[in-house]
Amino acid sequence: MFTTGLPEGVRSVEAGKFTGLGRGARQIVAPRVLVDATSVPADRGALGRYVDGLVAALDAAGADLAVACQRADEERYGKLVPDARIVAGPTAIAHRPARLAWEQTGLPLVAQQVDADVLHSPHYSMPLRAGVPVVVTVHDLTFFTEPDAHNPVAATFFKSAIRTAARRATRMLVPSKATRDELVRVLDADSTRIDVAYHGVDHELFHRPAQEQVRAVSDRLGLHGQLYLAYLGTLEPRKNVPALITGWAAAVCDLPDPPALVLGGGSGWSEEVDEAVAAVPAHLRLVRPGYLRFRDLPGFLGGAQVVAFPSRGEGFGLPVLEAMACGAPVLTTHRTSLPEVGGDAVAYTEPDSESITEALAQLLADRGHREALGAAGHARAEEFSWAASADAHMACYQRAVGQRGE
């Protein structure tokens, strides 16, 4: 590790691919990509799994890569992408307002310092004057199509960021055809500047769990072998968690041995989830463990009778893919991108609580159907990989470099 002429407070780790030569001193065989990972939250979440999976696959494929990250993530990315150059931003950008300001001022300087050919901003927002072509990932359009399902302040910011990306980004990446179509429909975005790159799944982490893993997670959750339904994701209105709680309670209320419902994920901004929890009959068990450790996710998902993800809208639906990779039967909705992920290997429901009740009751009553869904989902998950996603991203980066000056 050494200190370079980066902006004040910024540190860098040099890797062998970076010669330190200026742009004029080398030919561009493959683009040098700077991925801005500073928006990844401490709990990682779906955004962290996307960025981590992508940069690891890019690095493994031999991409000429640099990663800008939070200071707290410097060691993590140093191990995850050993052949890349890691640039840690100042400590202050751990706070969102400072990070957004640094995105406009510090990030372009980092792009210049590492001699990037293209900058990838993987979470909606971008620097307005980057000095290089910019690729922006737009995950979904629910800030426009489901505004009531988001914190109003966040919705206002992200709508502005998406509009800016649609106007000013060299190219946009989306994780599904549904998101591409929404971008075109809602914002009249230029479809020729949008590339679809499906997410992948880490098959080393997400796999059919051994019974020992299932038992260990069950004990850690305090279930001690009790059957349960699983949900993984933020507990917020867009994910339709209140309707899931109501639908589950109605589906299992009269069963002699009702399965618990475990809501794995951080709390969102709305009180609707708390209100739905308060209405659950006293004899039913609902567990809210918060964020789960990554290493516990296979046992948590694969040990569930059903993984329910009845979202009102997704850009992709990573929990659905991860649950399928763990061999779990999945119940989701037909909304937006979810059929692109689940195909015919999952069960579907409408997002209202009555439909969820009916679908869960049918699945819980038919073990054979659940096992068939688990097998089909596991096979379908094999079709998704971060290596394939990285290939699609690299093709987008190359197009962006080719458009420089347009």
Q: Where do the PLM segments sit?
A:
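Carbohydrate transferase catalytic cores enriched for Leloir-type hexosyltransferases
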Residues: M1-E406
